[in-house]
Amino acid sequence: MDVLSAVKQENIAASTEIDDLIFMGTPQQWSLQEQKQLTSRLVKGAYQYHYHNNDDYRQFCERLGVGEVVEDLNDIPVFPTSIFKLKTLLTLDDDEVENRFTSSGTSGIKSIVARDRLSIERLLGSVNFGMNYVGDWFDHQMELVNLGPDRFNANNIWFKYVMSLVELLYPTAFTVTEDEIDFEATLANMNRIKQSGKTICLIGPPYFIYLLCCFMREQGQTFNGGRDLYIITGGGWKKHQDQSLDRDEFNQLLCETFTLESPEQIRDTFNQEELNTCFFEDTEHKNGVPPWVFARALDPKTLKPLPHGQSGLMSYMDASAVSYPCFLVTDDIGIVREEEGDRPGTTVEIVRRVKTRGMKGCALSMSQAFTAKNDGGN
């Protein structure tokens, strides 16, 4: 993959350790222990940066009795993602904000996260880094068909923007306008790429991929993807959850509809609007966590870290975010594992969203503590 071309297009300067890692690293470059050392160093550095430069976050830490130096990553104060529905957290001056991104708002009030240029560039780097889990192509060897808008028409909706960034890495055709899929254009582009001898990558939310499959079946159309078609999904089923398929059913539908050689050609991605990094699945459909992100599962009642392999409330510390402190507790229940062997590193499995009042109440109390401090309650 010619990521340097994309880097030049966006005037990205990889000048620090984390930028070298994001823009020039590969997932299998380090042992598990080396990755853990990288994570510790980078996340602690990010914590000190935000502690010194973000008054809101520093006062929150002081309220919890945590100073600027931490020995253990688990000591770094985290806050619930619901904070972003209540206020804008900024470590930089307002005039350094490149864009303010919103969530899709499927569950009510939208989150708003302000990002500077470097944070956005690092997000692009995480997409490039994650594509290495899928395969290794130069930009002249693959073309993409995106069931979504380009980044100029994503209307600042985070998921749409993230999915559109691939156009900076590979030639990309966009076949959705205002959430309307042009099925014929999608298939025409896929056939054009196939005839050129290049690898095809179809990307989009799972519901849109599902609708394309339904259209093809209704029209009696087929596509022989063989080993030359990859399908990357992201964003979940959202408001179409009532039509969702479980993963095995979804994979089977895609393998049959597109005549794929293996389910390994189907990959999901994970990202949420408050997180500045995109996680890609490997060949075993495990979401790999890059070394600049610390992921853990917390006990929903005590918010204490759980042993690897146990399900709990997902928490992330993302060192790539410059414009805001990305030290989060989410509304997801998931499992964090450490992997050795051929693919060393940390993986996450998202099981479900939080449903019980007790779990949400814990996040609410943290939000109230954060906002109370901002109102002068020190």
UniProtKB/Swiss-Prot annotation:
EC number assigned by the record: 6.2.1.19
Uppermost EC category: ligase
MF GO annotations: ATP binding; long-chain fatty acid--protein ligase activity
GO biological process, one term: bioluminescence
InterPro entries according to UniProt: ANL_N_sf, LuxE, LuxE_bac
Pathway as given in its UniProt record: Lipid metabolism; fatty acid reduction for biolumincescence
Recorded catalytic activity of this chain's protein: a long-chain fatty acid + L-cysteinyl-[protein] + ATP = an S-(long-chain fatty acyl)-L-cysteinyl-[protein] + AMP + diphosphate
Superkingdom in the source lineage: Bacteria
Keywords: ATP-binding, Ligase, Luminescence, Nucleotide-binding
UniProt entry tagged with the keyword Translocase: no
Function summary: Acyl-protein synthetase activates tetradecanoic acid. It is a component of the fatty acid reductase complex responsible for converting tetradecanoic acid to the aldehyde which serves as substrate in the luciferase-catalyzed reaction.
Family of this protein: Belongs to the LuxE family.
Protein name (Swiss-Prot/TrEMBL): Long-chain-fatty-acid--luciferin-component ligase
